[in-house]
Amino acid sequence: MFGALARRIFGTANDRVLKPLKKHVEAVNALEPAFEKLSDDELRAKTAEFRARLESGTELNDLMAEAFATVREAAKRTLGQRHFDVQLLGGMVLHQGRISEMKTGEGKTLVATLPVYLNALTAKGVHVVTVNDYLAKRDSEWMGQVYRFLGLTVGVIVHGMDDLERQQAYACDVTYGTNNELGFDYLRDNMKFRLEEMVQRPFNYAIVDEVDSILVDEARTPLIISGPTEDNSDLYRLVDKLMPSLVAEDFEKDEKVRAVTLTDRGTEHVEEMLRTADLMKGTLYDIGNVSLVHHVNQALRAHKLFTRDVDYIVKNDKVIIIDEFTGRMMEGRRYSEGLHQALEAKEGVTIQNENQTLASITFQNYFRLYPKLAGMTGTAMTEAGEFAEIYNLEVVEIPTNLAVSRTDHDDEVYRTAKEKYEAIVTLIEECRGRMQPVLVGTTSIEKSELLSDMLKKKKIPHQVLNARYHEQEAYIVAQAGVPGGVTIATNMAGRGTDIQLGGNLDMRTRMELADVTDPAERVKRIEGLKAEIEVNKQKVRESGGLYVVGSERHESRRIDNQLRGRSGRQGDPGASKFFLSLEDDLMRIFGSQRMDGMLQKLGLKDGEAIVHPWINKALEKAQQKVEARNFDIRKNLLKFDDVMNDQRKVIYEQRKDLMSADDVSEEIVAFRHEVIAEMVARCIPERAYADQWDVAALHEEVLRVFNLDLPIAEWGKEEGIADQEIRDRITDHADRKAAAKVAEYTPDTMRMVEKSLLLQILDQAWKEHLLQLDHLRQGISLRAYAQRDPLNEYKREAFNMFEQMLLDLRERVTSVLAHVQLRFSSEEEAEQALEPQRPARTQETREDPAFSSGGSGAPFALAQRNTAVDPNDPATWAATPRNAPCPCGSGKKFKHCHGAA
């Protein structure tokens, strides 16, 4: 009560942000008459004027009112649209590096032009991030008219572009692109070997459209570039055949946390089947069967937790994941740790190889690279705490241009799903009777097709929009507001196209008049469409506007709000209602058994619903609990990813320094001296007597790393010799050998060799380190049983592993340079031979790839001492890369087999 009183007197936090901005809106409005009088050329000249003022020391904020007035006038002349005052407010909030929450239909796409133009004046580049290629292309063409009119360059990044096209797009003042493409370009850039090959410029300012979808829903899924490992497809198929034999008593399932485990009885059953199939000796949990346990667990998850047409669909011999928030197909995204391969085995499609990570980053860490970040969406307030804590972004609610006149009805709760769907069909029939359009939101393909079948039986014409048919999605959504139209859609999040009452003129013009080339005929037909849409719009308004029906509550209130927000745009009438049953996932998982008994006691008959505001409140509390749990999961994942992120920044910074350096000989010499110092310290401990020195081991180390056979044992017998003297002698011999090798070639060739090798070995070491980090992460949670904090344990061990990687890197670089034999007849030949080989068949995915032993060898394009490896001649095996399979045929890595010696 006191809170409400205080808000009435002092205003909300939101009001306090917007109040000082209103005087800037007045300033923009005051400039409008003068700017209307400017010619096109005079308006365009404003860009050069603003840039000159910035160079002379004027702050961006001081240019805001004039820049916004310029964009408003340019939009009127190019698009025929004028920014409303509330849109100016939204643009100012975005310029400040905050999130603008603007309701659906309030023109977010147009709002972005204001801060984009202002920040693009610095010529450092502005990125506008969208959720799919269609929206990136559409917005770059549509809003690009405004920027180009004002003399700015506009680029777009979409899938399938080559590096040159990407460089040109990123060099533009304004660049549109999807979150996936921008993130992958960052990773690919940090796998390049020359600065001029990199496509992105230093980060400056980004505006993220549908910011909640990208920074919250997709935050858990890392972007990964990976390379293939060995083929385990037969084992997946063999284990998969055992799963249908399991009965309910063989496993326990927890749907809240999406986990399934074998019971003792199930373990015995599986062991028996594995022995019969001759896949196992001993018991399932013997140390030698670790890989088998992994395959059994993933097959169990694939069969008992994942449902076809709900979690994934099968299309073109592939298992494609369906995004639980948007209902879209996630092409190229794969489940981690062998789960995707287990699903492929379950569905009988081609099993793709597991992969090893070459580079990865989460969206959380990618977008935190921008010095200035802003976002816009229709629904962010429910996640305001997360935006503030993780991204340091404040959410500001922008008032609507016209008051919302949508009626949000209380939820109707039925006992069974059958009754619920029958009630939805009845409501659709009623709406069609008065020609009111209906949009039904479902949570899965399966449910959308079930409802579609029910409507077909009633002979009710309708459109279905789900992951299967997403090619036509923009047109289907645009036409969802026609009189009597019925549209069924899996989660409406991120669809990006307005539902306009009566129909969408732009979309109909594009689809229906594509073949009409005669200008006069085209104008005539467009006028006809306009008149038809206006008549339809009036009919729909009279029938009550768009009726949005939710077929169940999502676990996130935000997704429900997004569905509701499709109705009642720009002051249009509309209505919304959610239909629920006790068989819905949210109700079933969060304690519906008690509720079922209660409803029976109340005498609820078949087909009757219970409707009460208290039920809405109870459901909202259940959703808040799920949201809080999901936030904790994301926050915890970020803490773990931050450990790798700090290391990634160090490695990527070092790579960039190496690429920009012409000469790395100083680093090479420092590496060599540090390696010798560490060798001597290991074999000749401080303050140890001469008879305690391990000179034999030191001799072996020097021979292995430097290919130098030195009389170290003889030196050790000399009277009064100290460890420093031995160290100096080894250093002297190693330096002389390196100098002799440099003298054989031109200085430029040797510099090229050193730089190329250093970059390639750094990449190989980083790749192996990522694999070790992943293995560490998978088992670290078990430390909690020993009363240790898994996060602190992970931080400590990851830091030690990183330090060890850097030590190993010095030794590997030193050793390769000492052993390598260079055979070049010309500098051109040297350049070709030193051109690093790109990893073959890399894959870009939106999930952690599965890991298994094995991997590709170091990508050296240099002739080493024994380059030809003969499997029948152990004398040639020394040339085998450390991570390649051992030539003996054991299946182990070379470094763990014959290379260990």
Swiss-Prot record:
<dbReference type="GO" id="GO:0005886">
    <property type="term" value="C:plasma membrane"/>
</dbReference>
<dbReference type="GO" id="GO:0005524">
    <property type="term" value="F:ATP binding"/>
</dbReference>
<dbReference type="Pfam" id="PF07517">
    <property type="entry name" value="SecA_DEAD"/>
</dbReference>
<feature type="binding site">
    <location>
        <position position="498"/>
    </location>
    <ligand>
        <name>ATP</name>
    </ligand>
</feature>
<dbReference type="InterPro" id="IPR011115">
    <property type="entry name" value="SecA_DEAD"/>
</dbReference>
<dbReference type="InterPro" id="IPR020937">
    <property type="entry name" value="SecA_CS"/>
</dbReference>
<dbReference type="GO" id="GO:0065002">
    <property type="term" value="P:intracellular protein transmembrane transport"/>
</dbReference>
<dbReference type="GO" id="GO:0046872">
    <property type="term" value="F:metal ion binding"/>
</dbReference>
<feature type="binding site">
    <location>
        <position position="897"/>
    </location>
    <ligand>
        <name>Zn(2+)</name>
    </ligand>
</feature>
<dbReference type="InterPro" id="IPR044722">
    <property type="entry name" value="SecA_SF2_C"/>
</dbReference>
<dbReference type="InterPro" id="IPR036266">
    <property type="entry name" value="SecA_Wing/Scaffold_sf"/>
</dbReference>
<keyword id="KW-0653">Protein transport</keyword>
<feature type="binding site">
    <location>
        <position position="87"/>
    </location>
    <ligand>
        <name>ATP</name>
    </ligand>
</feature>
<dbReference type="Pfam" id="PF01043">
    <property type="entry name" value="SecA_PP_bind"/>
</dbReference>
<dbReference type="InterPro" id="IPR014001">
    <property type="entry name" value="Helicase_ATP-bd"/>
</dbReference>
<dbReference type="Pfam" id="PF21090">
    <property type="entry name" value="P-loop_SecA"/>
</dbReference>
<keyword id="KW-0813">Transport</keyword>
<dbReference type="InterPro" id="IPR000185">
    <property type="entry name" value="SecA"/>
</dbReference>
<feature type="binding site">
    <location>
        <position position="886"/>
    </location>
    <ligand>
        <name>Zn(2+)</name>
    </ligand>
</feature>
<keyword id="KW-0997">Cell inner membrane</keyword>
<feature type="binding site">
    <location>
        <position position="888"/>
    </location>
    <ligand>
        <name>Zn(2+)</name>
    </ligand>
</feature>
<dbReference type="GO" id="GO:0043952">
    <property type="term" value="P:protein transport by the Sec complex"/>
</dbReference>
<comment type="subunit">
    <text>Monomer and homodimer. Part of the essential Sec protein translocation apparatus which comprises SecA, SecYEG and auxiliary proteins SecDF-YajC and YidC.</text>
</comment>
<dbReference type="InterPro" id="IPR004027">
    <property type="entry name" value="SEC_C_motif"/>
</dbReference>
<comment type="similarity">
    <text>Belongs to the SecA family.</text>
</comment>
<protein>
    <recommendedName>
        <fullName>Protein translocase subunit SecA</fullName>
        <ecNumber>7.4.2.8</ecNumber>
    </recommendedName>
</protein>
<dbReference type="InterPro" id="IPR011130">
    <property type="entry name" value="SecA_preprotein_X-link_dom"/>
</dbReference>
<keyword id="KW-1003">Cell membrane</keyword>
<dbReference type="InterPro" id="IPR011116">
    <property type="entry name" value="SecA_Wing/Scaffold"/>
</dbReference>
<feature type="binding site">
    <location>
        <begin position="105"/>
        <end position="109"/>
    </location>
    <ligand>
        <name>ATP</name>
    </ligand>
</feature>
<keyword id="KW-0963">Cytoplasm</keyword>
<dbReference type="GO" id="GO:0005829">
    <property type="term" value="C:cytosol"/>
</dbReference>
<keyword id="KW-0472">Membrane</keyword>
<dbReference type="GO" id="GO:0031522">
    <property type="term" value="C:cell envelope Sec protein transport complex"/>
</dbReference>
<keyword id="KW-1278">Translocase</keyword>
<keyword id="KW-0862">Zinc</keyword>
<dbReference type="GO" id="GO:0017038">
    <property type="term" value="P:protein import"/>
</dbReference>
<keyword id="KW-0067">ATP-binding</keyword>
<dbReference type="InterPro" id="IPR014018">
    <property type="entry name" value="SecA_motor_DEAD"/>
</dbReference>
<dbReference type="Pfam" id="PF02810">
    <property type="entry name" value="SEC-C"/>
</dbReference>
<dbReference type="InterPro" id="IPR036670">
    <property type="entry name" value="SecA_X-link_sf"/>
</dbReference>
<dbReference type="InterPro" id="IPR001650">
    <property type="entry name" value="Helicase_C-like"/>
</dbReference>
